[in-house]
Amino acid sequence: MKALLYWKHRSAGASLLFLFIFTFTLTACGGNTESNARSLPQSHNSTTPNTSSATSTAQIVLGRQPCPAVVSTPSHWDSIIGTQNGVSRIEGVNCATLIGVPVLQALVTVRYEGTGSYLDVYVFNNITGANPVQLFKLQGLNKGGARISKYNTILTAEVDLASGVNSNQPGTGVIQDLFREFKWSDGAGTFVQVTFPGIFPDLTRYQAEADQEQVNQGHQPWKLDADMTANALAVNMLKWSTSAQTTIVSGGGSHDLNAVVTVKSTSPGGGTITVTLSRLEGNANGGIWEATAVQAGNMATITAPLNRDLLTSPVTVAGSGSVLGGNIGRVLILDHLYNTIGHAEVKGTTGAGNGNTTFSASVTYRSTFRAGAEEGVVVLYIEDHTDGSLATAVMEKELLGA
């Protein structure tokens, strides 16, 4: 399957956040549905952050905050990081409360001259002290970018040179297409890669915040409608007709935070999917809808891997489904561009006849991004045997290890 839909990088803008999200963030990394995925640790300073001499704030505040004047200039960080004149330079310094305590940390980015325009990303604590403590370092992001999210995580963007949109392109023709998110983990003592819960219309928080800004400016207003978002998912990911019928099961109102919507195909078999959606960052005042799960009712389920798990290839996909002629359907692994990078035919348990049964399939995939993990989707497609169209599907968000 080729890329179903590609959402270009756009500048993210501000969106309103409710008080319960603020309270939610105070828990840092524990007990948060935004951080339940197994994560990839990154290089870090093993020393426990010392906040006694750090720059304190009155409270934990969501999003970027003004840096203390003494650390806000790029020149302050040249000697700390060790930039080289004519080779590298400090590109940006931004501050926020990133580790779950009311103390400012600094996100410092370093840009390299020459082909690739590579970016290194650093996070420091004790930023006004004589010896700031490095908490995180991520190097070599091709044409990279980094910023602080409205959820106090680190968002990065870079070029995946081997991806479907950049492979065989000249250097001037490549674009940012690989987006990652890193969140502070007390247990790991550093920032670890986590998954954004969304499947569609955005796979990553970087893209979602950019989409929110576009919607705030009056573009793509359908993303404010749960029905239309569920329909767009069916059109783009199952190739259903735009006239597929949607029905609100719960929520979905102008001030609701969650919604469940069924979408019914117009094909002769008339298959149905159930789409679960939530508002971006819990913002009921104009927050866009993000589909977080797709279910097939009694037709099929996926029991493994767990939603938002960290996968390695080959991955075992297990579940249940209705068998007809020995076949249940197809399992696909979709990468960060919704391209298929692994697939397997799914058959029922040996000896099972027609009807509902369990299955287990080993799926080998190969990610085009080899420098870490990427956000993707595991999909179970069930075909309509009357015309060969897709009757229904199960989709789960995952973190795809290289």
Regions found by a protein language model. Name each.
Residues R111-T115, L161-N166, S267-P268:
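Short glycine/acidic-enriched loop and turn motifs that connect beta-strands
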Residues G92-V101, N126:
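Acidic, divalent-cation-chelating loop motifs in proteins
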Residues F136-G140, T246-S250, I341-G353:
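Solvent-exposed serine/threonine-rich low-complexity stretches and specific carbohydrate-binding patches
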Residues T128-Q139, D177-F200, G271-A300:
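Short beta-strand edge/turn micro-motifs at domain boundaries
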Residues I99-V110, N152-E158:
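Acidic/hydrophobic-patterned starts of short beta strands in beta-sheet-rich repeat architectures
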Residues T23-L26, G30-P41, P49, A54-A69, ...:
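Acidic, small-residue rich beta-repeat scaffolds with periodic aromatic anchors
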Residues M299-I302, D309-A402:
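Ser/Thr-rich low-complexity repeats and stalk/linker segments
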Residues E91, G140-S149:
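Repeated scaffold domains used in trafficking and secretory/extracellular systems
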